[in-house]
Amino acid sequence: MVIKKVLIARDYGKHAEHAAEYGFELARKFGAETGLVNIVEPVILPSVTTTDPIIGMPTESLGVDERELMDIQQSQSENIVDQTIRKFAADMQVTHFTEYGSTADGIITCAKEFNADIIVIGTHSRTGLDRLLMGSVSEHVVRHSPVPVLVVPLKGR
């Protein structure tokens, strides 16, 4: 097996941080190109207007700016990517991606675009009912990825 390109998925949790460290070490061992992806999921804002109780018509907006919210998310994404590279890959050339949309689908799309040979992802910390209702990002990636997926647990750390 030859691994020429490793794609590392990074979110804001400890599981993903540990997986990133593991992924960069794997890339070093194989002398592989490395990609780092962070997915920005769109935030759906609830209706932010107040309604006049007598006439039932909207009276004013609460002023939440979706563009500003997207800028904040973009900034957070850039920060986590930069911090991860500084911490684990300062000596490496890393191609980084910020994708928008569903986390699992974004990782898979990025893997295809990067021509990754393997995806490295952390286990997700969801458990119980939350996992049942929401699903698992790593599970979705494993089931739908066109390339092998290495799921790195936090246990044993």
Residue spans of the language-model regions?
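Structural beta-alpha unit
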Residues: 1, 42-44, 75, 79, ...
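Gly/Ser-rich helix-loop-strand patches that form or flank binding pockets
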Residues: 108-157
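A short acidic, glycine-rich active-site loop
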Residues: 57-76
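General small-molecule cofactor/ligand-binding pocket signal
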Residues: 37, 95-99, 150
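Short, well-ordered coil/turn elements that cap or connect secondary structure elements
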Residues: 29, 89-91, 144
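Small/aliphatic-rich secondary-structure junction motif
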Residues: 2-63
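Active-site phosphate/pyrophosphate- and oxyanion-stabilizing loops and adjacent acidic/basic residues
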Residues: 24, 82, 86, 139
